[in-house]
Each structure stands twice: as structure tokens, then as C-alpha cells.
Amino acid sequence: MSQNASVGIVTPQKIPFEMPLVLENGKTLPRFDLMIETYGELNAEKNNAVLICHALSGNHHVAGRHSAEDKYTGWWDNMVGPGKPIDTERFFVVGLNNLGGCDGSSGPLSINPETGREYGADFPVVTVKDWVKSQAALTDYLGIGQWAAVVGGSLGGMQALQWTISYPERVRHALVIASAPKLSTQNIAFNDVARQAILTDPDFNEGHYRSRNTVPARGLRIARMMGHITYLAEDGLGKKFGRDLRSNGYQYGYGVEFEVESYLRYQGDKFVGRFDANTYLLMTKALDYFDPAADFGNSLTRAVQDVQAKFFVASFSTDWRFAPERSHELVKALIAAQKSVQYIEVKSAHGHDAFLMEDEAYMRAVAAYMNNVYKECQQ
């Protein structure tokens, strides 16, 4: 399906919101910006809009290229575009960079209007609820009364679920992919180790590293390297790299010897070049705090009791970060609450990252579901 046409050259838009946003922690952003991209056309009935919510390291650039010279397309270009599962010839698709991000939306790199300086570590901790609240403001700005679908993988899937709970009347369908109704203890532990790598980097400077012309590159690199391991499946990693060495024989030192070591260093270095450490801290805390059942006596069934959306839930067989059993929890709760849900477990060797990759069964399942969403738009 990815051989079909791309959305082409796209231009991001920064949308200013000159209004306060009260956050879940009680703090208030006096104003905020959201960076977005849109693909396709909103129909006259305004009932064909689809919101794409990104995962930890994602952003608004879902599909296409920003210039003809761009080496890479958007992070979900195989999913979003003409003739693709989320078809931009049928749907008006919106991608955004969440609050706390580092790609144009208000976050640690933004100017604090109260001080005239970058927020840095002073940018408040944000939650999935806060993101959805800001996305609702964007929905109003775009003149959309109800999303045909809210779609997301991993942390993005958590946002899709929260949308159905916070604004049940504004979502017709939720596609929750490779996600979970809350993080496991192990995942919280992984996130804390990643944060400690950043927080203990001597160049972190209590989060105000940019004002001191430093970057906690070592900590962010290690955080990404460890995170990247958890996104991959052991078998897939073994088949790709095995125990292959970069040169003939062991070097009997502590440099890079195995191909897998070289790969992880490359991924870490690349990440440091495009991502902000404070944003990484914020995103992982949003993951940790997400637990919609906590507001309903720790009952996920009660949490989804009032949702009006129909659900598509997908998991991947080798995803051990967000294992299929976590999706089963959501599916069981939806069934217990007598909600409409379709579920698929995709056999894949790619672990958690499979939701970003082109798997025929996965793509066909999403395409079939979105085809039915489109048919509803025509009624």
C-alpha cells in the first residue's frame, strides 16, 4: 500500500491559542501554541475529520515531505495518504505536536510569556488529559464538531482512549493500536531509568542546559538506546544482527565491537540531534500517569461506561513493551460495558515498533475498518 501516492509537499501550521489552559496538576499555561499539519479536505458536512495522535518521539509531521529535498517522509507515511489505509482522498487528516513537545508546540523550548525566556525545566508537567483538552481546543478552532476517528499507536493510543472518555460525544471511532489502558510496573521502571540517565548527566544543569550552552547528550543518548531495545523483539533483533562483529575477531576492549552496539549508538546519536531532553522527561511522565480507571474506582469498565465511540484495537504478537494482554484488558472492559469493539492481534517479528511498519495483515485490517468509517460519513 505504501507504493501509492504520497500527500506530497506539506506545510506545518502553528496555531496560537490566546487563552489560558488549566492543567491537571493545577498549574495554568497563560497561552499556548499547537503545531499541526493537515492532509486532504474537510467535506461540507465536516464529518470526515480524523485526528492522528503521536507516540513519545513523534510529532505533527505524519505524512509527506516538507520539501522536495527531504530525505525522510512523515513518521506514518505508509498509513496516511491517497489510497492508503487512512485515505486522504476520503478523510481530512490532522496531525499535531503535543504540548511539551519540541517541534513547534508550546514546550520547554518555547518562550515563557511571564519571563521572556525559554521555559526549559520550568515548563509544567503535562498529562494525557491535558493533551486531549488542548486537542479539543484545536477541534473547536478547526470547526469540527465530531471526529470521524481518533487514531494513535502506543502513547497515541492512550490519547485516543482518553478522547472517548473526556469527550464521548465528539468521537465516532477510536483506533487504539499497540497501546495499553495504563503502564505496567516494568514500563514505569524503564521510564525512570531513562529519566535518571538524563537527570544525572553533568550537562543537564537542572534542565536549564540551553541557557548555559550545554546539552545532556550522554544521558539522552543512553535513554534512547535503552528505549529502542524495548521497542524491538528479541527474535527480530537476533535475526537482524545476531552476534556479528564490525571487524574480524574480538578487540578485548570497551569500544563498539558488535553490529548491534553500532546500531544502538547510531540511533542514540540521531535522536540527540533532533529531540529535546526536557521533552523526553515530560513525555515519559505523561505515560506513567495515564490511568483512566483511577478516576472510576480503578474500574476500567466503569471508565468506558459512557463512551459513545466504536473501537478498533490492535496489538502485535512480539510486542513485550505493550503486550497483547494489555490490549485484552481494554477489549474485555469494552465488552463488559457493552461497547462496540473489533480486535486484531497481528503476528509480527518487529516488537512494539510494528505499529509503524508495513505489515500486510495490519494494513488491511486498518484499511477495512476505515472503509466502514468512510461509509458512515456518506450516510
From Swiss-Prot:
UniProt-recorded name of the protein: Homoserine O-succinyltransferase
Residue ranges constituting the AB hydrolase-1 domain according to the UniProt record: 48-357
One Pfam family this sequence matches: Abhydrolase_1
Matches recorded under NCBIfam families: homoserO_Ac_trn (TIGR01392), PRK00175.1 (NF001209)
Sites where the protein binds substrate: R224, D353
EC number(s) recorded for this UniProt protein: 2.3.1.46
Reactions catalysed according to its record: L-homoserine + succinyl-CoA = O-succinyl-L-homoserine + CoA
Signal peptide: none
Keywords of this entry: Acyltransferase, Amino-acid biosynthesis, Cytoplasm, Methionine biosynthesis, Transferase
Residue positions of the active site: S154 (nucleophile), D319, H352
SUPFAM superfamilies, per database record: alpha/beta-Hydrolases
Lineage: Bacteria, Pseudomonadati, Pseudomonadota, Betaproteobacteria, Neisseriales
The keyword Amino-acid biosynthesis is assigned to this record: yes
Main location: cytoplasm
Subunit-level organization: Homodimer.
A GO term, aspect molecular function: homoserine O-acetyltransferase activity
Superkingdom of the source species: Bacteria
Family according to the record: Belongs to the AB hydrolase superfamily. MetX family.
Pathway: Amino-acid biosynthesis; L-methionine biosynthesis via de novo pathway; O-succinyl-L-homoserine from L-homoserine: step 1/1
Site residues, Important for acyl-CoA specificity: R321
InterPro entries: AB_hydrolase_1 (IPR000073), AB_hydrolase_fold (IPR029058), HAT_MetX-like (IPR008220)
Location relative to the cell: Cytoplasm
Gene3D superfamilies for this protein: 1.10.1740.110, alpha/beta hydrolase
Function field: Transfers a succinyl group from succinyl-CoA to L-homoserine, forming succinyl-L-homoserine.
GO biological process: homoserine metabolic process; methionine biosynthetic process
Record organism: Neisseria meningitidis serogroup A / serotype 4A (strain DSM 15465 / Z2491)
Designated gene of the protein: metXS
